[in-house]
Amino acid sequence: MADEAETLDAAHGATDAAHGAADAAHASSPGMPQLDFATFPNQIFWLVLTLLAIYFVLTKIALPRISSVIAERQGTLTNDLAAAEDLKRQAAEAEESYNTALANARAEASRIAQETRDEIQAQTQVEIDKADAQIAARTAEGEARIAEIEAGAIATAEEVARDVATEIVRAFGPGQDVDAAAVADAVANRVRG
């Protein structure tokens, strides 16, 4: 065991010596290591290698995925726009068919209203014609009665006038013979005008 302890002490001593040398190297280097011109070729190599690795990762992995997502979104947008245009066209067609149906319904309602008015007018005209015929019949009947009454009145008046004229002639000329035909002609001429 003693040998092991000596070996460990020797290893610690070597490690301490290495740390001391590293500390001495750090103490002797001026400022930041990125700005040390002695390490520029090594830094440029790793910079180019890193940029190439980033370029490879971007061009082979990231950009194709981004491009596919953009293409998918563009396709979705295009499909949505096409669907929106189709819906807009369908809405315009529906509105046009609605307006056409509304215009047809209005025309049909107007036609039905006109037919109803015409039918009512025809029925009214039939009733008016019927009433006119009844009025004309009653008027003709009334005129016939009036003519009959007038004829009866004239006949009665003529008869009364003949009787009165005969009596007047007898009163003025007692014992004279009365000419009934002459009295009747005189009364008829006077009554008829």
Swiss-Prot record:
Whichever gene encodes this chain, its name is: atpF2
Please provide, alphabetically and separated by semicolons, the GO molecular function terms listed in this UniProt record. proton-transporting ATP synthase activity, rotational mechanism; proton-transporting ATPase activity, rotational mechanism
The family classification in the record reads: Belongs to the ATPase B chain family.
Database matches in CDD domains: ATP-synt_Fo_b
Presence of the UniProt keyword Plastid in the record: no
> Which species does this protein come from?
Jannaschia sp. (strain CCS1)
Report whether Cell inner membrane shows up as a keyword of the record: yes
Q: What is the protein's known function?
A: F(1)F(0) ATP synthase produces ATP from ADP in the presence of a proton or sodium gradient. F-type ATPases consist of two structural domains, F(1) containing the extramembraneous catalytic core and F(0) containing the membrane proton channel, linked together by a central stalk and a peripheral stalk. During catalysis, ATP synthesis in the catalytic domain of F(1) is coupled via a rotary mechanism of the central stalk subunits to proton translocation. Component of the F(0) channel, it forms part of the peripheral stalk, linking F(1) to F(0). The b'-subunit is a diverged and duplicated form of b found in plants and photosynthetic bacteria.
- Fetch the Pfam families from UniProt: ATP-synt_B (PF00430)
**What membrane topology was assigned to this protein in its record?**
Single-pass membrane protein
| Subunit organization | F-type ATPases have 2 components, F(1) - the catalytic core - and F(0) - the membrane proton channel. F(1) has five subunits: alpha(3), beta(3), gamma(1), delta(1), epsilon(1). F(0) has three main subunits: a(1), b(2) and c(10-14). The alpha and beta chains form an alternating ring which encloses part of the gamma chain. F(1) is attached to F(0) by a central stalk formed by the gamma and epsilon chains, while a peripheral stalk is formed by the delta and b chains.
Record localization: Cell inner membrane
The protein's name is ATP synthase subunit b 2
- What Gene Ontology terms describe where this protein resides (cellular component)? plasma membrane; proton-transporting ATP synthase complex
Q: Which residues cross the membrane?
A: 44-64
Q: Which HAMAP family match?
A: ATP_synth_b_bprime
**Alphabetical UniProt keywords:** ATP synthesis, Cell inner membrane, Cell membrane, CF(0), Hydrogen ion transport, Ion transport, Membrane, Transmembrane, Transmembrane helix, Transport
